[in-house]
């Protein structure tokens, strides 16, 4: 793989690429398809890893098919091979389509990777930023001091031509963009690429990498104006004394303070400014969150600006209710499988002054994250682990597998859900999900052996329970003793994608 990357780097450094920025000749290079197949060039930075569908298990056979594909590309008058071509009809037709699309995706990623990877390498421990859980510590630190939150659903493009037009600002190679357009037009269902929920689309599985690249490029352009305005906008709050500053995590926030000099007539006290950005913004896939300390009127102006910007520049029509504005104090928003919000926690502080003591009632804001039980049960119903009432049922399609395989599958799902939802402040709903999965596993084994759940549990004993325990539970139990384990939030920095059972849209 290092040899392939070295060869690719050598091609990119030649004068012809520097002057003309041609990318399409890479379609005739065999190592491009090897990199696309192996997800090289750190491609996981741009999107989540996907399954390699349609490839032969035999690498030699796959390599031979790629060589035949390149040979036929040389023999064509144009690079795009029609789906009606009789020479490409057969068991390899799906592979050819997928290979070309992944080759296109890998080539189009080159300009982005050359700019992004060096900038990330300058950031210490930038790998941690890839974790989905890295968003929540940011929200935990910021949202407790903000007033309004806006849920934004980024609209899908109405036509693929809009996606291709957005690439022109990032990729200067016009022939490559023209070839990409021709390739997409060769497929009858090419417009269905913009709706990934359609399983009948030819892009739904085979060409998922190309779809993700185009969609992420579209989202990047839609939010680019937000990032620009976010950097340009900030407001300063004048505070006459340091005592008015919030004492929570004071030493961590002291770096955000600046002292503004006064004129000669105002030398009594310095002016303290709290350098706070006007807007905080986070996003995952097509769902984004904006939060601010500004007024409701200003939030509505942001909403009006976004809707008009998308309509004028991208011809995107925001869905009714695509942008919701709510107060953080009395509203919770659903994001990345968590129901998040800010709630007031009552505190009683005892103050001692000489011989007198006082009890002071106060309240502090805390960022709260819980796991909603009904969306998770809905996902389990779709996966046929339980019915609509949450009653566990057997997984009949797994009944033909071995006992160890059945237990391992259920245990793997349970551990992944526990690992992802470790940041919940209330673990009661997660315990119910674990109970459903354990009982569904027992019912599946009972169905296989034509027995009862009680007999299966008695025969397997602790083996059935140990498979559902996570290593994190054993380690964390040494850190948080007693009941604190149920209320402590733990964020992991190794989660780069959401479990399939977690509803996040």
UniProtKB/Swiss-Prot annotation:
Primary location recorded for the protein, binned into one broad class: plastid
Domain of life: Eukaryota
An example Gene Ontology CC term for this record: chloroplast
GO MF annotation list: RNA binding
GO biological process entries: mRNA processing; RNA splicing; tRNA processing
Compartment(s) of residence: Plastid, Chloroplast
UniProt keyword list: Chloroplast, mRNA processing, Plastid, RNA-binding, tRNA processing
Family membership noted in the UniProt record: Belongs to the intron maturase 2 family. MatK subfamily.
Function: Usually encoded in the trnK tRNA gene intron. Probably assists in splicing its own and other chloroplast group II introns.
Descriptive protein name: Maturase K
Gene transcribed to yield this protein: matK
């Amino acid at each position: 793989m290092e040899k392939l990357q070295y060869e690719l780097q050598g091609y990119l450094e030649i004068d012809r690429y520097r002057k003309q920025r041609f990318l399409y000749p890479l379609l005739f290079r065999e190592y491009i398809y090897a990199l696309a197949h192996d997800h090289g060039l750190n491609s996981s930075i741009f999107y989540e890893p996907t399954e390699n569908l349609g490839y032969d298990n035999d690498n030699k056979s796959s390599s031979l098919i790629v060589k035949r594909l390149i040979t036929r590309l040389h023999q064509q008058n144009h690079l795009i091979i029609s789906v009606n071509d009789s020479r490409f009809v057969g068991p390899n037709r799906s592979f050819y389509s997928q290979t070309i699309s992944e080759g296109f995706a890998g080539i189009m990623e080159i300009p982005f990777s050359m700019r992004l990877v060096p900038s990330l390498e300058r950031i210490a421990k930038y790998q941690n930023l890839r974790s989905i859980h890295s968003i929540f510590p940011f929200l935990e630190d910021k949202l407790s001091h903000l007033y309004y939150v806006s849920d934004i659903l980024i609209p899908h493009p109405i036509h693929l031509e809009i996606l291709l037009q957005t690439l022109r600002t990032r990729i200067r190679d016009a022939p490559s963009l023209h070839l990409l357009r021709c390739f997409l037009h060769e497929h009858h269902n090419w417009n269905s690429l913009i709706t990934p929920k359609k399983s009948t689309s030819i892009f739904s599985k085979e060409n998922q990498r190309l779809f993700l690249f185009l969609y992420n490029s579209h989202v990047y352009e839609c939010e680019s104006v937000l990032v620009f305005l976010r950097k340009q906008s900030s407001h300063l709050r004048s505070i006459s004394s340091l005592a008015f500053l919030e004492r929570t995590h004071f030493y961590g926030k002291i770096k955000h303070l600046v002292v503004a000099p006064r004129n000669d007539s105002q030398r009594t006290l310095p002016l303290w400014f709290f350098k706070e950005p006007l807007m905080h913004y986070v996003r995952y896939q097509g769902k984004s969150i904006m939060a601010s300390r500004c007024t409701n009127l200003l939030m509505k102006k942001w909403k009006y600006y976004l809707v008009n910007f998308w309509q004028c520049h991208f011809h995107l029509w925001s869905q009714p209710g695509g942008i919701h504005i709510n107060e953080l104090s009395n509203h919770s928003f659903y994001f990345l499988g968590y129901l998040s919000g800010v709630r007031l926690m009552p505190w009683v502080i005892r103050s001692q002054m000489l011989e007198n003591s006082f009890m002071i009632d106060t309240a502090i804001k805390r960022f709260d994250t819980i796991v909603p039980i009904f969306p998770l049960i809905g996902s389990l119903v779709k996966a046929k682990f339980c019915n609509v009432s949450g009653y566990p049922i057997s997984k009949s399609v797994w009944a033909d597998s071995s006992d160890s395989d059945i237990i391992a599958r259920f245990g793997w799902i349970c551990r992944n859900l526990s690992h992802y939802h470790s940041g919940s402040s209330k673990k009661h709903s997660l315990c119910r999900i674990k109970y459903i999965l354990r009982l569904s596993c027992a019912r599946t084994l009972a169905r296989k052996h034509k027995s009862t759940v009680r007999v299966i549990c008695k025969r397997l004993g602790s083996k059935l329970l140990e498979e559902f325990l996570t290593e994190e539970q054993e380690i964390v139990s040494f850190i948080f003793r007693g009941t604190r384990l149920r209320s402590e939030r733990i964020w992991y920095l190794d989660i780069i994608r959401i479990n399939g059972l977690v509803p996040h849209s």
